[in-house]
Amino acid sequence: LLVVDDDVALPRGFLDRFLFLADRFGFMLAQPAHRRRSHAAWRVTRRQPAVLARETRFVEIGPVTAFRRETFGTLLPFPALTMGWGLDVHWAAIAAEHGWPIGVIDAVPIAHVQRPPAAGYSRAAALAEAESFLAGRAYVPRAEAGQTVAAHRTWR
């Protein structure tokens, strides 16, 4: 399953390369890295030069997120959240509990050309919704979410 926002610029040949590398490294959840001038909320999602892909402890909810079929029974359907803030740190905890490798594909960086964050909605309301959603649920703390487990420079 591939979830794509409406404000993302994908490079030529993106889909085949992205899915090939996500599959090659066995990522259960994957996202493309952000280009240098792309809006990225998390430093770990920024492109790393000379790296094809990285196994990380976190995959962001957007602007592009891929889910392997094996995750569907656990992660779908998505909860009824307005903005979805906090869902990705919860997914990261679930992935860790299940031993699922997750990661960022650096070889196909995208540009998230979004409007300024929270321009179309209340940032305070989104934060309150995230806090409410995460209360009583497992989630990966920010410091852990920023960690890279392994960097892959070749696909073989």
Language model features: what each stretch is:
Residues L1-A9:
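Short beta-strand-to-loop acidic/aromatic patch adjacent to the donor-nucleotide binding site
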Residues L81-R156:
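C-terminal catalytic/acceptor-binding lobe
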Residues L2, A30, G103-I105:
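Hydrophobic/aromatic beta-strand patches that form the interior of the parallel beta-sheet core
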Residues P11-G86, A92-A93, E97:
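Conserved catalytic core of nucleotide-sugar-dependent glycosyltransferases
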